[in-house]
């Protein structure tokens, strides 16, 4: 079980709703993933039009929690305005906060992100900030009132997996009471498993499932990867070693096997 702002969910896999070949495949993938939380973009769908109504009905049929995002916003003002519109439209105080600084890398504007988070939290929002793996940025977000922090594994859509394991591990070690979600850059179920093995509470992804040859099958694979990673973390992974360590004890080895 994982908790976000006082609400508890069974699945540790959060999934996006964009880029799927069809609405039916999107629904099938979300079901196969077992996800309880789906991200939606206000910029992509407008509930005021026929397309928006149809999309919203599909999401409602899934009986999942909705996490609106501010994807595409490049300023504090734009992100705050989009968040307020999303709250009115979707009826939730949750917001996945994105403030983008660079078009090529889609790297977060960390200064603007912290500023926007502080504004929204004062206005009653429960913020899920998309950030880099920088500890100082994450700490500032926590100081602003965020109870969830979502560092990237790698740039959005890159499918490169965890590129800075040490930094992500440091975040987990230094922020033990904060819900941490790896968001962006996940390309394979093994990447998701690695994040959960580090002690992260969940992962959020979209492209790796939506752009797979078989999104529904891939969603199931990610579900299994997340479950395996969390189970491994709870079981207690052995520490890595620089040198070999025999798995077979030498005590009691027959003398004729001894090395002279």
Swiss-Prot record:
<dbReference type="GO" id="GO:0005737">
    <property type="term" value="C:cytoplasm"/>
</dbReference>
<comment type="similarity">
    <text>Belongs to the ThiG family.</text>
</comment>
<dbReference type="GO" id="GO:0009229">
    <property type="term" value="P:thiamine diphosphate biosynthetic process"/>
</dbReference>
<dbReference type="InterPro" id="IPR008867">
    <property type="entry name" value="ThiG"/>
</dbReference>
<feature type="active site" description="Schiff-base intermediate with DXP">
    <location>
        <position position="96"/>
    </location>
</feature>
<keyword id="KW-0963">Cytoplasm</keyword>
<dbReference type="GO" id="GO:1990107">
    <property type="term" value="F:thiazole synthase activity"/>
</dbReference>
<feature type="binding site">
    <location>
        <position position="157"/>
    </location>
    <ligand>
        <name>1-deoxy-D-xylulose 5-phosphate</name>
    </ligand>
</feature>
<comment type="function">
    <text>Catalyzes the rearrangement of 1-deoxy-D-xylulose 5-phosphate (DXP) to produce the thiazole phosphate moiety of thiamine. Sulfur is provided by the thiocarboxylate moiety of the carrier protein ThiS. In vitro, sulfur can be provided by H(2)S.</text>
</comment>
<feature type="binding site">
    <location>
        <begin position="184"/>
        <end position="185"/>
    </location>
    <ligand>
        <name>1-deoxy-D-xylulose 5-phosphate</name>
    </ligand>
</feature>
<dbReference type="InterPro" id="IPR013785">
    <property type="entry name" value="Aldolase_TIM"/>
</dbReference>
<keyword id="KW-0704">Schiff base</keyword>
<dbReference type="GO" id="GO:0009228">
    <property type="term" value="P:thiamine biosynthetic process"/>
</dbReference>
<dbReference type="Pfam" id="PF05690">
    <property type="entry name" value="ThiG"/>
</dbReference>
<keyword id="KW-0784">Thiamine biosynthesis</keyword>
<dbReference type="InterPro" id="IPR033983">
    <property type="entry name" value="Thiazole_synthase_ThiG"/>
</dbReference>
<keyword id="KW-0808">Transferase</keyword>
<comment type="pathway">
    <text>Cofactor biosynthesis; thiamine diphosphate biosynthesis.</text>
</comment>
<dbReference type="GO" id="GO:1902508">
    <property type="term" value="C:2-iminoacetate synthase complex"/>
</dbReference>
<protein>
    <recommendedName>
        <fullName>Thiazole synthase</fullName>
        <ecNumber>2.8.1.10</ecNumber>
    </recommendedName>
</protein>
<feature type="binding site">
    <location>
        <begin position="206"/>
        <end position="207"/>
    </location>
    <ligand>
        <name>1-deoxy-D-xylulose 5-phosphate</name>
    </ligand>
</feature>
<comment type="subunit">
    <text>Homotetramer. Forms heterodimers with either ThiH or ThiS.</text>
</comment>
């Amino acid at each position: 079980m994982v908790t976000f702002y006082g609400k508890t969910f069974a699945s540790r896999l959060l999934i996006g709703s964009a880029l799927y070949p069809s609405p039916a495949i999107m629904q099938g993938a979300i079901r196969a993933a077992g996800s309880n939380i789906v991200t939606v973009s206000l910029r992509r769908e407008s509930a005021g039009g026929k397309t928006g109504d149809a999309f919203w009905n599909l999401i409602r049929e899934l009986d999942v929690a909705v996490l609106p995002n501010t994807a595409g916003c490049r300023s504090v003002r734009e992100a705050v305005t989009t968040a307020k519109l999303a709250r009115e439209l979707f009826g939730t105080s949750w917001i996945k906060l994105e403030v983008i600084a660079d078009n090529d890398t889609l790297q977060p504007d960390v200064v603007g992100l912290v500023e926007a988070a502080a504004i929204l939290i004062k206005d009653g929002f429960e913020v899920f900030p998309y950030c880099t793996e920088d500890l100082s940025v994450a700490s500032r977000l926590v100081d602003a009132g965020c109870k969830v922090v979502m560092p990237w594994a790698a740039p959005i859509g890159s499918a490169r997996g965890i590129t800075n394991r040490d930094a992500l591990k440091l975040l987990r070690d230094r922020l033990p009471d904060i819900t941490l979600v790896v968001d962006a850059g996940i390309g394979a179920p093994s990447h998701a498993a690695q994040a959960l093995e580090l002690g992260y509470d969940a992962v959020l992804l979209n492209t790796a499932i939506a752009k797979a040859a078989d999104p529904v099958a891939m969603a199931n694979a990610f579900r299994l990867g997340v479950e395996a990673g969390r189970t491994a973390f709870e079981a207690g992974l052995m520490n890595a070693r620089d040198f070999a360590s025999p798995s077979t004890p030498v005590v009691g080895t027959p003398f004729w096997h001894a090395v002279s």
